[in-house]
């Protein structure tokens, strides 16, 4: 099967890789978690062990460093936070144009839910998954699932 036989999404996915992810306290800028791992692989459930103190932060800054061989007209992602398979939160982020053969860092700020809506870490631990779908316009590139453990 040649590259001409791949769908647009498959072609982008083949050359797409997450190099690392960093979570920072949005107020202080201090790194609270970092992982040099490609979380974009669609056929596995990834795991992340994040410090429990993340649940007490007002906002978290997320940096995704990624590389792509193909250009993308409108790189965006949809992210769902699920508790035992049920959607708790959903966010939509848009980066825009990404050039071919580039490495990029995308930073987004995520604000915490109101304290009255927060659940204790012992309830959340291992029961929360983050499902991230990466798109170029409406073309699905890959879908990643990460299960969270609080340490």
Swiss-Prot record:
Its main location: nucleus. The keyword Mitochondrion does not apply. One of its GO terms (biological process) is sensory perception of light stimulus. One of its GO terms (cellular component) is nucleus. This is Probable cGMP 3',5'-cyclic phosphodiesterase subunit delta. Gene3D superfamilies: GMP phosphodiesterase, delta subunit. Keywords: cGMP, Cytoplasm, Nucleus. It is found in: Nucleus; Cytoplasm.
């Amino acid at each position: 099967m040649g590259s001409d036989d791949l769908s647009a999404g498959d072609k982008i996915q083949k050359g797409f890789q997450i190099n690392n992810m960093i979570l920072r306290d949005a107020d202080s800028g201090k790194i609270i978690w970092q992982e040099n791992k490609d979380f974009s692989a669609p056929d596995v459930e990834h795991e992340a062990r994040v410090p429990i103190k993340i649940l007490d932060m007002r906002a978290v800054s997320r940096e995704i460093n990624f590389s792509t061989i193909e250009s993308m007209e409108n790189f965006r992602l949809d992210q769902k936070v699920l508790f035992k398979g049920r959607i708790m939160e959903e966010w939509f982020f848009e980066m825009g144009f990404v050039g071919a053969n580039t490495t990029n860092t995308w930073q987004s700020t995520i604000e915490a839910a109101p304290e009255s809506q927060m659940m204790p870490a012992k309830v959340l631990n291992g029961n929360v998954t983050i499902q991230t779908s990466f798109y170029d316009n409406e073309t699905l590139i890959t879908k990643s699932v990460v299960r969270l453990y609080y340490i």
